[in-house]
Design a protein with these regions (language model features):
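Flexible "arm" and connector segments at domain edges
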Residues: 1-63, 67-155
């Protein structure tokens, strides 16, 4: 896949049209926060409509618009300079949901069964074991899952 440079492209738009780009992580004024949430909700509604209409062109448009508005929010919340590091930490955390061994996967299945009766199944692919909830095929976190530590990055 080709790499996307959405933050810098949207920063160009913000600079051109005078939209805020904050240099330090912060929560903007309530009206700006409400605008950001409203814009994201609007684009998400367009995605839902495009999916319902089975219209791939409109799906692509909605996804691009969501990425554009989301990138604008990252800039307006002053997260632009730290976003790669933040995203990489979320990626690391998400990947820790996978199990490194069949034993870890079996312990994970037992953990969910003992915790609340959740039935799970193990799937191995390329030396990685994944645990899925049987009811809906949702990925379940390994017993060795490690949550993202975004706080240390934002300090």
């Amino acid at each position: 896949m080709e790499k996307l440079d959405s933050l810098n492209q949207v920063a160009q738009f913000h600079t051109t049209f005078g939209a805020p780009i904050l240099t330090q992580p912060t929560i903007p004024a309530a009206e700006r926060c409400n605008l950001r949430v409203s814009l994201l909700a609007e684009e998400l509604d367009e995605l839902k409509e495009a999916i319902a209409a089975n219209d791939l062109v409109e799906v692509a448009d909605a996804l691009c618009d969501l990425q554009y508005v989301l990138s604008g929010a990252v800039l307006e919340f002053g997260l632009g300079e730290k976003f790669v590091e933040l995203f990489n930490e979320v990626q690391r955390s998400n990947m820790s949901k996978a199990c490194a061994s069949i034993e870890e996967a079996e312990y994970t299945v037992k953990f969910y069964q003992d915790k609340d009766g959740t039935e799970a199944e193990i799937k191995e692919e390329n030396g990685v074991w994944k645990v899925y909830r049987k009811a809906d095929n949702k990925v379940l976190k390994s017993i060795n899952y490690s949550p993202a530590d975004l706080k240390s990055i934002l300090k």
